[in-house]
Amino acid sequence: ITLLLLAFLCLVPALRAQENNEDKPWSVNEATLFGVGGYNIKDTYLSPLKYSGWGMRILNERMKMTRLSDYRISRQQFINVDFAFTRNPAETASSFAGFVDYSLGYHYHFQPQPALKLLAGASVRALGGFIYNTRNGNNPASAKVETDLNLSAMAIYKFQVNNYPFALRYQIEIPV
């Protein structure tokens, strides 16, 4: 039995090498953003006041061509994580907030010119998070959940400056 198992394990990679793999080698475009900045939070369930402060964000975007429609449809996903610490105007109370946002979209590619790509598609987005107010005793926190469906369009223009490649991209999403 051990010999049979060993022969099988040696045979599987050889069979896999015989596959006719016609996958096109597409790159995955990925970008990650780390940010720190000012936040304004107003949740009338917790307080009628606007809380201001600072927060941190990590945003990751991945874009990849798929096999759909003869490799003319790309998949784009965003993952965004936010944390914020804010205080009321009198600085007598503070709040903490945290959100996770995920978006998944598919775009069909049109190429009217060699340097210009136009993309059209749709995306779905989901957000979950919380706001915790340190001053409230009875209802100290509120949960946030959102989902939406969006129409999405993108334009990508590629050019060179002194033999350095550049790309300009503009994207718009409209909730339906």
Label every model-predicted segment.
Residues K24-T32, S69-Q77, P114-A122, N162-I172:
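Outer-envelope beta-barrel architecture signal
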Residues K50-I58, S94-Y102, L116, A141-L151:
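Residues that define the transmembrane beta-barrel architecture of outer-membrane proteins
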Residues I1-S27:
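Cleavable N-terminal export/targeting peptides
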Residues N138-V176:
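Outer-membrane beta-barrel transmembrane domain signature
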Residues A17-F78, T86:
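Short glycine/proline- and aromatic-enriched beta-strand/turn motifs that initiate or cap beta-hairpins
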Residues V36-K42, V81-R87, V124-Y132, Y157-F159, ...:
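Transmembrane beta-strands of outer-membrane beta-barrel pores
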Residues K42-K50, T86-S94, N136-S142:
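Extracellular loop and loop/strand-boundary signature of outer-membrane beta-barrel proteins
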Residues I58-T66, V100-Y108, A122, L151-Y157, ...:
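Residues on the lipid-exposed face of transmembrane beta-strands in outer-membrane beta-barrel proteins
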